[in-house]
Design a protein with these regions (language model features):
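Composition-driven recognition of glycine/serine/threonine/acidic- and proline-rich low-complexity segments
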Residues: 1-162
């Protein structure tokens, strides 16, 4: 496992280059963009895969005003897994309408936030490469104002976007 702690979203290209050097891999442009993308992952994957996507909830548990969930983002036409994600969602920091939509489990948090026009900032905290299972990943915090609304880990296997 090769891990790079990201100090700032503005220096992430240097961090990606460090990851390539330490792990002896060469990422293609799509993989680099996946690691640094600070927009909605689901929309970005739709463009990369040239396919509409849907969210598959593997597990979703709500306890003490926190939702933990595991999801896959898959292509609607082929059912191909594009990304696997684990998230912790802090409901106390979200409006009721957004909480209700998250509980339904039909859309990713990024799409829900986009549709509800909630101002957020994605702070990428770590990127890495798992050499045993051959996937790149990133960790980030989703913030609204000074409040953390979610912590997310997204995994992208090499064949997910090809």
């Amino acid at each position: 496992m090769f891990i790079i702690n990201v100090k700032s979203n503005s220096t992430i290209l240097n961090d990606i280059l460090k990851l390539e050097k330490r792990s002896s891999i060469k990422l293609n442009s799509f993989e680099k963009i996946l690691l640094m993308n600070n927009g909605t992952t689901e929309l970005f994957l739709q463009i990369l895969s040239n396919s509409l996507t849907k969210l598959v909830i593997i597990q979703q548990i709500e306890k003490n005003n926190i939702i933990t969930r595991k999801i896959n983002i898959i292509t609607k036409d082929r059912g191909k897994i594009l990304a696997e994600a684990q998230s912790i969602i802090y409901l106390k920091n979200l409006p009721n309408k957004i909480k209700d939509e998250i509980r339904k489990g039909e859309k990713g948090i990024g799409m829900i936030i986009l549709e509800n026009k909630l101002e957020t900032y994605k702070r990428i905290t770590e990127i890495g490469y798992n050499s045993k299972e051959s996937y790149i990943y990133r960790k980030y915090k989703l913030l609204s104002g000074k409040h953390i609304i979610s912590k997310v880990i997204e995994n992208f296997k090499g064949d997910m976007i090809k």
